[in-house]
Amino acid sequence: MAKMQAKVQADERDDGLREKMISVNRVTKVVKGGRILGFAALTVVGDGDGRVGMGKGKAKEVPVAVQKAMEQARRNMFKVPLKNGTLQHEVHGKHGASTVLLAPAKDGTGVIAGGPMRAVFDVMGVQNVVAKSHGSTNPYNLVRATLDGLRKQSTPADIAAKRGKSVEEILG
């Protein structure tokens, strides 16, 4: 199975969503009569204000696979609570053999993250974050682990509601 890593491409459509293609892989299905070639695309979509979604698409042609992935990413979008262009608190995410550590950063730090994680933060609109990946560097697993970590975030209001206290008491 030949592997073809694509450059991360950005695109902004008329609906205001940011789209990034993370990878396109050439895949092969072996049948009795020979090989059937196809393509698998991995994309992320975000609104630049905390909403993000991931999609994957498979087809015989690259543009069709990318289009399917973009449509799936738009359907799978969810909201991430941000605080001044960064994360609320440090969080760990895991998927498969990939583990990621996501930490908030001060203004001026920028996005310190590798490959697929950087694409997720770019489409989300995060300006300052530090991210470190451990284990598998498979782009699909890294994106899923990053999204897992982002889903685990909680706001001070969420924590206050769980503890039965006011937000002022939590923030101290």
Curated annotation (Swiss-Prot):
GO terms for cellular component: small ribosomal subunit. Residues 17-80 form the S5 DRBM domain. GO terms for molecular function: rRNA binding; structural constituent of ribosome. Pfam families: Ribosomal_S5, Ribosomal_S5_C. InterPro entries: Ribosomal_Su5_D2-typ_SF, Ribosomal_uS5, Ribosomal_uS5_bac-type, Ribosomal_uS5_C, Ribosomal_uS5_N, Ribosomal_uS5_N_CS, Ribsml_uS5_D2-typ_fold_subgr. GO terms for biological process: translation. Part of the 30S ribosomal subunit. Contacts proteins S4 and S8. PANTHER family: MITOCHONDRIAL RIBOSOMAL PROTEIN S5 (PTHR48277:SF1). Belongs to the universal ribosomal protein uS5 family. With S4 and S12 plays an important role in translational accuracy. This is Small ribosomal subunit protein uS5. It comes from Burkholderia multivorans (strain ATCC 17616 / 249).
